[in-house]
Amino acid sequence: MNTVPRYAVFGNPVAHSKSPQIHRQFALQEGVEIEYERICADTGGFAQAVEAFFADGGRGANVTVPFKQEAFALSDEHSERALAAGAVNTLILLENGKIRGDNTDGIGLTDDISKRLGVELSGKTVLLLGAGGAVRGVIPVLKEYRPARIVIANRTHTKAAEMAAHFGIEAIPLDELEGGFDIIINGTSGGLSGQLPAVSPKVFEHCTLAYDMVYGEAAEPFLAFARQSGAKQTADGLGMLVGQAAASYRLWRGFAPDVLPVVQYMREL
């Protein structure tokens, strides 16, 4: 019988996921051996795939696109963060056999901005571009930092307005945005196809930090546009990725990994 603790990330597609490399680095820090695999679940077959994984000895799992809402529905109980987001990216198998759902995306983002990058969130004006699951997942934790103002802008304004109403924040149409934002966070997936959010350069005039939730080359179109438009500092989402993974690892194993060396390691791959 295999006694090495097993973990996995579920998604579709999932072959590109860096989670196995990240969690192997965390295990090295803890001084333990773990198995961490990628599992591509079929659309409509997510619940069965998760149940089979846990039945076969799995201890915990990460969940990525497009299954975060399904993971929420699958969970027997939820953290407050997961309840607020309506989405789950971390599944924990409890001793009683039940599955607990959590969402560590918001921690990954806010820790990266406030701790690694040293940018204050409290009292600042924050613009979120996009109104999909990535943005929804981070708003509850972002609100805990008490920014002076959080605004959502999205290509489809009605979607942004609905999300803003749900969380008690603001929504402004993309073409009506003006400057005055301290922190601008791109939560759209446009960079993956080289597309930019349809915002005016003047939106970045007073921007302290422009941040893209995606990482590497996919983040560069937005970050380059932000720099050219006046943003003082830019960052991609690699630190968020490692940070949310570290929070998941801690939930599973009670060990808090050091994020910074793993961000540096992943950057050099």
From Swiss-Prot:
The keyword Amino-acid biosynthesis applies. NADP(+) binds at residues 80, 130-134, 154-159, 213, 237. GO terms for cellular component: cytosol. One of its GO terms (molecular function) is NADP binding. It holds the Pfam family Shikimate_dh_N. Pathway: Metabolic intermediate biosynthesis; chorismate biosynthesis; chorismate from D-erythrose 4-phosphate and phosphoenolpyruvate: step 4/7. It catalyses: shikimate + NADP(+) = 3-dehydroshikimate + NADPH + H(+). The active site is at 68 (proton acceptor). Shikimate binds at residues 17-19, 64, 89, 105, 215. Involved in the biosynthesis of the chorismate, which leads to the biosynthesis of aromatic amino acids. Catalyzes the reversible NADPH linked reduction of 3-dehydroshikimate (DHSA) to yield shikimate (SA). Homodimer. NCBIfam families: aroE, PRK00258.1-2. Belongs to the shikimate dehydrogenase family. This is Shikimate dehydrogenase (NADP(+)). The gene is aroE.
